Amino acid sequence: GIDIIRIFDCLNYLPNLQEAVNATNRMKKQEGRGHAQVALSYTLGDAYTLEYWADTAKKIEEMGADSICIKDMAGLLVPYKASELIKAMKENTKLPIQLHTHYTSGVAGMTYLKAVEAGVDVIDTAMSPFAMGTSQPATEVMVETFKGTPYDTGFDQNLLAEIADYFRPYRDECLKNGL
């Protein structure tokens, strides 16, 4: 089943998220499962300083969330800004932080590299047949990037290749049909 409930408001207005966090926490208490993950919509602008993100992370922790996901839907987060962002948020919260970015601007893999080095706990990837473009970086590439480092996943590249080979015909069929 699904245990991580990603809770999102496109304006990052935390009061809109409180009831969903509460409901997830009730489920966790009653059924022994459920993880309230508050997703923040990453964006640019004068209001979105490192202090804004760090303070918001602390407020999310105080809401009772289990983790935070930074959702960079437009691929705006660049590598060194990701490093600064993760460090600032980690200084203000003990919650695990997940990063979800898109390859739209072509820097997502490098952004993940710097975010991991800065202490992000989880990165979202996609198997190579579905990766890149407006999707996430390829799982296989990120696994190889971290091989032999303190961030080594231990994933088997041969198994990942089998998984990619399995899904490639489905991707090709979708492309053939204009999806």
Question: Model features per residue range: what roles?
Answer:
Residues 1-179:
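Catalytic cores and adjacent flexible loops of soluble metabolic enzymes
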